[in-house]
Regions:
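C-terminal motif of bacterial Sec signal peptides marking the signal peptidase cleavage site
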Residues: 2-4
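Bacterial signal peptide processing site
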Residues: 6-9
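Structural signature of tandem alpha-helical TPR/SEL1-like repeats
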Residues: 45-51, 76-88, 110-122, 145-153, ...
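Structural marker of alpha-solenoid helical repeat scaffolds
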Residues: 58-62, 92-94, 125-126, 159-161, ...
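TPR/TPR-like (Sel1-like) alpha-helical repeat modules
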Residues: 155-198
Length: 213
């Protein structure tokens, strides 16, 4: 396969597989490519994942940015086998933390926590300054019962994300599971963590320790 060759994403076959033979690891750098990706990201941000997938499938798949979104959208629309196939091929061909992250998240959706941790740890090492990767790795560590390590990863993600997003709840859950009152106080003083958020974190805490390893 020649890197940089544009191709349309293949239709899913009756066996439920996708053709990944034209995967390329190059970044999408052309202005029209960036416009395409921004439009797809906007749909994803609104939760319109089926529409985003349809839009993506109408575009040439001429860069890793397209394939990463393709795998993510396949997973978010319930096509986990196809998503896993895309991400595994990306991992084989591209040394990229985002590919490992995607594969780890597919494993997490399957409730395969240990398999997810393997890939998310590699993603974390490849992309140490990614708040999303550190958050998702920390969340998987919570599911595995590794609360101290999870708290470190999630606090790092919180700081990288400037205190915004779902990591707020995750780090609070980690502190609750560890009985870390000092950490909870820091969330209140440093990041304006409210009592309502704390109550919600207490409710979320009940789900941990129940995942199959």
């Amino acid at each position: 396969m020649l890197a940089g060759c544009a191709s349309q994403p293949s239709q899913t076959t009756p066996e439920g597989t996708v053709d990944t033979s034209d995967i390329t690891c190059q970044e999408a750098v052309q202005p029209e490519q960036r416009v395409d990706l921004e439009m797809i990201d906007t749909l994803m941000g609104k939760g319109r994942n089926h529409a985003a997938l349809a839009r993506l499938e109408s575009k040439p798949m001429d860069g890793i940015d397209y394939w990463l979104r393709y795998g993510q959208l396949l997973a978010s629309t319930g096509k986990l086998d196809d998503a896993e196939q895309v991400f595994r091929e990306l991992v084989l061909q591209c040394v990229d933390g985002r590919s490992r992250h995607g594969l780890g998240m597919v494993q997490l959706k399957r409730n395969h926590v240990n398999a997810a941790l393997l890939h998310l740890e590699i993603a974390r090492n490849l992309s140490p300054a990614s708040a999303q990767v550190r958050n998702d790795y920390g969340y998987a560590l919570l599911l595995a019962g590794r609360y101290q390590q999870a708290a470190f990863e999630l606090r790092t993600a919180l700081e990288l994300a400037n205190g915004q997003g779902p990591v707020r709840q995750n780090v609070a859950v980690a502190y609750l599971l560890r009985g870390d009152e000092q950490g909870l106080d820091a969330l209140k003083s440093d990041y304006g963590f409210s009592e309502d958020e704390l109550d919600y974190a207490r409710a979320l805490r009940q789900q941990f320790g129940k995942s199959e390893q």
